[in-house]
């Protein structure tokens, strides 16, 4: 039988499971709730309530086929910012409520983990996992993932809302380098290995029922209750009349500059094919960056949402960067209620069939789909990644529960169509969603197979950290649910400059120019959205 949340907490309290956490006492929570007027456009809510405030996050979902909005989750205020660099994790209290949270969770850190706490910042130092022990044992070693578990498990959730503890944020692609020997790489931006926010005020917008609920979580005691009640009234008032987005800063003749020109990228593809011929790998996914001005990222995100609605859409406003995107692909999903773990591999891409005026030519589009489904190379590449997903899911699932729920479907987006599949299983009783993510990172569609060797080759040819690209953005709840998407079809923005990164799967019979073209095709939806947003007024309905 599956361990419920309380069962997991008992194990942690007894010190039987976790080497970094010892629950000495469960803290108390109080969740304050209020209904607010429904708004169809969450970007207007974000602009109205958050504007330029950092440590805020908007997560949105849409139905794949109809493109209808489903739900939007907005972290308005964060109590704590959790940031990981290498094996060092720092918790920064952003409010008095956040200080109360840190004071409590600090009591539950095991003595074996080096820690320092000054009342506002808690720093944990983890050690490099031993690479001589087996994979299962490595999952149980103390690691930077335990910093997130510390918040998850330090409070009594027995009678609380599922979002009472809500952590939203980003796992960078390079987080895996803390666990696997990938080699050195330079940084092209300031992206940490991960950054998560513990929500203090959370806005939940249900587009199906056209309802909107605001909640605030009071940690440990009631000392900040009056302040939170006042903040709720503040936000409610702002939600009654959401402001239109201001006009985006106009930029003339925006062009995207590739980090690697076509000729050089083609040579990278040829070089990597040699490793396929030698049998080192079956597939590898090199990428390149396209940079362009993006002084108004929220306007660009709104344009991207309208032009390329996707199952996962996100806008993250950190103190170091802004990240936005419309991703077609789930990274890893775990639902506590069903105990199901899920990976959604996407591989096999074609441009949409369009007329010269840009409208979809449905007859041409259908013929392109047929050609995609019939392409032996694309099918072989896709099935290779389905097998990789099957292996990943099998390692963390109960015996006999892993299966392929969907195989070789076609999902359509504004500029491209993809072959997609879905692999599911029942998570083992001795693991949680973070164990599952650690075991599976990074997703095979952004690495190749075998995964570790492919990631090493990617480091060799790219020479730089990928940062957010190929990582995962999403949320984790106190009761254990994890929902993340792969950070693709996205823009990472620092100092008004966007980095749009895209890759292509290289196999034995890859055509170098076709792979270079594929990176442009995948990046185009985001590039076009940035260009469109900065060449016209943003405040359209």
Swiss-Prot record:
GO terms for molecular function: anthranilate synthase activity; metal ion binding. L-tryptophan binds at residues 61, 311-313. Chorismate binds at residues 348-349, 469, 489, 503-505. The keyword Ribonucleoprotein does not apply. InterPro entries: ADC_synthase (IPR005801), Anth_synth_I-like (IPR019999), Anth_synth_I_N (IPR006805), Anth_synth_I_TrpE (IPR005257), Chorismate_C (IPR015890). Pathway: Amino-acid biosynthesis; L-tryptophan biosynthesis; L-tryptophan from chorismate: step 1/5. This is Anthranilate synthase component 1. It comes from Vibrio parahaemolyticus serotype O3:K6 (strain RIMD 2210633). The lineage of its organism: Bacteria, Pseudomonadati, Pseudomonadota, Gammaproteobacteria, Vibrionales. The gene is trpE.
């Amino acid at each position: 039988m599956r361990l419920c949340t309380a069962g997991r907490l008992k194990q942690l309290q007894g010190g039987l499971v976790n080497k970094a956490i010892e629950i000495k006492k469960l803290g108390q929570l109080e969740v304050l709730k209020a209904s607010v007027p429904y708004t169809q456009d969450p970007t207007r809510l974000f602009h109205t309530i958050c504007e330029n405030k950092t440590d805020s996050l908007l997560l949105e979902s849409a139905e794949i086929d109809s493109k209808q909005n489903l739900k939007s989750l907005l972290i308005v205020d964060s109590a704590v910012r959790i940031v990981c660099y290498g094996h060092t994790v720092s918790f920064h209290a952003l409010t008095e409520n956040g200080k109360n949270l840190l004071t409590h969770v600090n009591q539950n850190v095991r003595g074996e983990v080096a820690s320092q706490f000054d009342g506002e910042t808690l720093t944990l130092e983890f050690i490099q996992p031993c690479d001589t022990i087996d994979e299962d044992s490595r999952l149980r070693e103390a690691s930077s993932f335990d910093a997130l578990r510390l918040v998850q498990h330090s409070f009594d959730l027995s009678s609380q809302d599922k979002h009472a503890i809500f952590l939203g944020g980003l796992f960078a692609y390079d987080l895996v380098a803390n666990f696997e020997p990938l080699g050195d790489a330079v940084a092209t931006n300031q992206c940490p290995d991960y950054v998560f926010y513990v929500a203090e005020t959370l806005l939940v917008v249900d587009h199906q029922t056209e309802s909107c609920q605001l909640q605030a979580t009071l940690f440990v005691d009631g000392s900040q209750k009056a302040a939170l009640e006042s903040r709720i009234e503040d936000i409610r008032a702002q939600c009654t009349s959401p402001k239109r987005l201001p006009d985006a800063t106009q930029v003339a003749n925006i062009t995207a500059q590739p980090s690697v020109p076509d000729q050089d990228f083609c040579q990278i593809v040829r070089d990597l094919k040699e490793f396929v011929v030698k049998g080192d790998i079956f597939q590898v996914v090199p990428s390149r960056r396209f940079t362009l001005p993006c002084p108004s990222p929220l306007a660009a995100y709104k344009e991207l949402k309208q032009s390329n609605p996707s199952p996962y859409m996100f806008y993250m406003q950190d103190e170091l960067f802004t990240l936005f995107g419309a991703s077609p692909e789930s990274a890893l999903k775990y639902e506590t209620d069903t105990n199901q773990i899920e990976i959604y591999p996407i591989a096999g891409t074609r441009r949409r069939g369009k007329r010269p005026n840009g409208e979809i030519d449905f007859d041409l589009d259908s013929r392109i789909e047929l050609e995609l489904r019939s392409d032996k190379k694309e099918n072989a590449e896709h099935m290779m990644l389905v097998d990789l997903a099957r292996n990943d899911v099998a390692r963390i699932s109960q015996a006999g529960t892993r299966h392929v729920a969907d195989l070789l479907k076609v999902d359509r987006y504004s500029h491209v169509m993809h072959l997609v599949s879905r692999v599911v299983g029942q998570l083992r009783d001795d693991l949680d969603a973070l164990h599952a993510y650690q075991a599976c990172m990074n997703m095979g569609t952004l690495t190749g197979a075998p995964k570790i060797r492919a990631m090493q080759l990617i480091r060799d040819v790219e020479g730089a950290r990928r940062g957010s690209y190929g990582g995962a953005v999403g949320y984790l709840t106190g009761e254990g649910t994890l929902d993340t998407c792969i950070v693709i079809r996205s823009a990472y923005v620092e100092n008004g400059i966007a980095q749009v990164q895209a890759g292509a799967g290289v196999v034995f019979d890859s055509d170098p120019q076709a792979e270079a073209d594929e990176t442009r095709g995948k990046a185009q939806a985001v590039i076009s959205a940035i260009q469109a947003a900065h060449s016209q007024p943003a405040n359209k309905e």
